[in-house]
Amino acid sequence: MNFPWDQLLVKGNWMIISAQIAAPFLVIGLIAVISYFKLWKYLYKEWFTSVDHKKIGIMYLISAVLMFVRGGIDALMLRTQLTIPDNKFLEANHYNEVFTTHGVIMIIFMAMPFIFGLWNVVIPLQLGARDVAFPVMNNVSFWLFFAGMILFNLSFIVGGSPAAGWTNYAPLAGEFSPGPGVNYYLIAIQISGIGSLMTGINFFVTILRCKTPTMKFMQMPMFSVTTFITTLIVILAFPVFTVALALMTADRIFGTQFFTVANGGMPMLWANFFWVWGHPEVYIVILPAFGMYSEIIPTFARKRLFGHQSMIWATAGIAFLSFLVWVHHFFTMGNGALINSFFSISTMLIGVPTGVKLFNWLLTLYKGRITFESPMLFSLAFIPNFLLGGVTGVMLAMASADYQYHNTYFLVAHFHYTLVTGVVFACLAGLIFWYPKMMGYKLNETLNKWCFWFFMIGFNVCFLPQFILGLDGMPRRLYTYMPSDGWWLLNFISTIGAVLMAIGFLFLVASIVYSHIKAPREATGDNWDGLGRTLEWSTASAIPPKYNFAITPDWNDYDTFVDMKEHGRHYLDNHNYKDIHMPNNTPVGFWMGIFMTIGGFFLIFESIVPALICLAGIFITMIWRSFQIDHGYHIPASEVAETEARLREARIKEREAVSHES
């Protein structure tokens, strides 16, 4: 076996060396803590091998928050480098690595698992379902994502990170990027992408087949509707990217020439493949975010969502148009006027259904009895900030004007105004909103609001000046500039904004830690002062029972739960319990994830034999699973009755305590 040992150690500045020294101690420390508290068996049996959608969702969310920290550190490094002219904080290639990993981590390893985590926690509960359609696949999906995440983050200290940008354009990502860096990009995203595709298929079938029988599609909660439409985008878009990654992997490792002009390949083929996936990917993360806003705004406005059916059709329209706009990412790359005109118009058209959504949210707020809890603050801040991102998007959609905006900081500001306000605000709002459903207690609202104000103000301080920098000609991906360029002051202000955002995130961390220690535990399930409007609020808090619902709930309207509460039927209990069938835990996903991680690592360093051995291990695991006779197990009706009796008693005590305090 010829393994390139000389490529393992990354020789760089003090930050890389510090990370290389710290990483082994962090791993050893984590192992020591788990061993000291004797948690290995508990973690393996209750979490790593779990097929409970709620626990898998929490594991996704923990991973996403960790990646938010990693991506945020990258962002602070970028802003520190650009704070003053001719800064020596980062050298050119290290800067390229950092902005590449920042983009990949924030979109693929932060935003997507955040969305998938909330899908797992909320969607089956909103649908009145026991679990997802394919629980074992759900476990496998998570571990494939986790394997890709581990591999990509390993690149910083072992072998070197990719430095060709998050778009990884050929030929820069080919012959001009020697070493394992781009291989990390290709293999890690490929493994994670397979898991994402499996998740899309799983939730597509779950929403079709597992929702409560009386729930019709046009009456589903908006988060479930946007999830269903998003799964269609995942199923259609991810295979394209899977093929593109496989072709570039073949180019780099096996010497094919799909993206090399000299031998009949076509570099622009990669750009088309990437953006046929890449622009729908934006809507893969933003449509579920729209669904979250459509749950949070009616809750704290105490009103029905205005225009529910028009919201569904607008979501479908956005999803359809998302596949017809990819060329707007390279208007300047030599297309003819006819092609640019078509994609310019199709891009502008997306503003129509998006505008419908914005007006529906505003009309939901109109004459509502609004309370300003932190999820609502994020939702309200989203509307004007996202509008600015959308308007600048229409400016960029004009092909002739794009020749001036393209690859400047105007574009950087635009996509951060859409993705941060559209997705990150929603993820933070959704995490706070559904946190009591997962953990049984609310996060501290004072700290949450400090998080909001620092994060929202910091965001605008950071990115609003970048519109001006772009109009003044500052190119994106520029690692330094001269004093004579005149960009110092705005870059300095932008960096201050990034620091404010980091402080805001620290307030959220403080809220999580403080609330874990101090917050009162809640049992009612309808945690936001009884304002919940969908079925997940009818179940117990703190990871609801494995079976979710003791009886199958009825659902006749998208505000059925509000009507149920008005008539005193909000806890879905007729005492007519039956045995409930549930799936068994499985080790398949965990071990496939280990094989994927090890095999992917060897393939990154082009060591084929060990990679093939790990591939064989994956197939053996799948074959072993196929021969297992696993019919699941049943929770006896008597156990269901005991559980429900305990929950009723806890709810009574909680209501009495609230009445006594008032």
Curated annotation (Swiss-Prot):
CDD domains: Ubiquinol_Oxidase_I. Its main location: membrane. It comes from Staphylococcus epidermidis (strain ATCC 35984 / DSM 28319 / BCRC 17069 / CCUG 31568 / BM 3577 / RP62A). PROSITE patterns: COX1, COX1_CUB. Its EC number is 1.10.3.-. Its cofactor is Cu cation; ferriheme a. It is an enzyme of class 1 (oxidoreductase). GO terms for biological process: electron transport coupled proton transport; oxidative phosphorylation; respiratory electron transport chain. There is a cross-link at H279-Y283 (1'-histidyl-3'-tyrosine (His-Tyr)). This is Probable quinol oxidase subunit 1. It is a multi-pass membrane protein. Fe(II)-heme a binds at H102, H416. Catalyzes quinol oxidation with the concomitant reduction of oxygen to water. Binds a copper B center. Keywords: Cell membrane, Copper, Electron transport, Heme, Hydrogen ion transport, Ion transport, Iron, Membrane, Metal-binding, Oxidoreductase, Respiratory chain, Transmembrane, Transmembrane helix, Transport. The chain crosses the membrane at residues 14-34, 56-76, 103-123, 140-160, 187-207, 228-248, 273-293, 311-331, 336-356, 376-396, 415-435, 451-471, 492-512, 587-604, 608-627. Cu cation binds at H279, Y283, H328, H329. It is found in: Cell membrane.
